[in-house]
């Protein structure tokens, strides 16, 4: 399976593929790792704008690991995932740019389909940040056959997931806002 690995020489290639018609699945909450960091570093400012109960939701953290899930998938050897990219730095926008770039593939995605927590939206509005560019360390973009079935599997394992788009012909990257 081919993934994108950021190393000292840029992105490396492994086995795998992306082809038109495949679905793009996002697992994990968009920007939530960055939200947790903001919560740690800006607690005093946040306390002036949000109720304590709302901020306590940060204490739950992330109860799942997309990295561990993907590791298990690779070990099992029967995954519908043919290519993947952990979002991390640069957020889901970076993953949307980098993954199809490795395969010279196009994509068509809808931002409103991405799993995102309300607390992330609120923090981004307060600090003028873009949730799709916010650090997304526990977020995974995957190309797969049968994306709907993959989403159901992920959800059964407690990982939020959605089909967010499709692989298309050509090199274009269409990003819609669902409006």
Predicted segments with their positions:
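Helix-biased detector of long, well-ordered alpha-helical tracts
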Residues: 1-179
